[in-house]
From Swiss-Prot:
Any one of the GO BP annotations: 'de novo' CTP biosynthetic process
Function: Catalyzes the reversible phosphorylation of UMP to UDP.
Broad class of where this protein is predominantly found: cytoplasm
Matches recorded under CDD domains: AAK_UMPK-PyrH-Ec (cd04254)
Pathway(s) where this gene product acts: Pyrimidine metabolism; CTP biosynthesis via de novo pathway; UDP from UMP (UMPK route): step 1/1
Binding partners and assembly: Homohexamer.
GO terms for MF: ATP binding; UMP kinase activity
Name of the featured protein: Uridylate kinase
Keywords: ATP-binding, Cytoplasm, Kinase, Nucleotide-binding, Pyrimidine biosynthesis, Transferase
Amino acid sequence: MTDQTTTRRVLLKLSGESFGGGQMGVDPDVVSALAREIAEAAKTVEVAIVVGGGNFFRGAQLSQRGMDRGRADYMGMLGTVMNALALQDFLEQAGAATRVQSAISMTQVAEPYIPRRAVRHLEKGRIVIFGAGAGLPYFSTDTVAAQRALEIQAVEVLVAKNGVDGVYTGDPRTDPSATLLDTVTYQDALQRGLKVVDSTAFSLCMDNDMKMVVFGMEPGGNVTRAIRGERIGTIVSN
């Protein structure tokens, strides 16, 4: 890793769906390809990652079917740890030194989440994967990504999406007139009710002047490009 004062540090948010290739569970081919992209970019950039768990459980959806929301959210958090461990394995196969930190104590599989330790890992050239969300119910992993980015002093949050390549004026899956935005302010995104990223994450970044880039995972190479800082997707800022 190069001089700490000049090295770019980013927080990459990966949805659980990106691990399953649209299916439940983990698709080894998909995660292996993703890990190779991240490992390549991490040679010159300090990379921390927050992973979702939607390929296993979605707490909000389970709670709509009558399950206690807190319990459902904890199940989702455990799903994110499974994804974190899978990604760690494939990153190490790709030659990248990696650490997993969990917001819920599980010392046999992951370190506890300690911000200063995470920063030290990054400075040593290791990729740090944050699992178990915030360790608290009612917090989305989008919000956790914004919070972790602020705490480790990343320069921006990179939100990788499946099925869309940035922020649109509406939902492109249901609104044929929706157009891709090159840039948008947090205020505008919140006022329009744009749902591509959780509104709490938008608010947290807005209040702390943290830049966000929302981009599509396809085609291959996009994750590497985003981590390196190439112009891609939609820039969300103040």
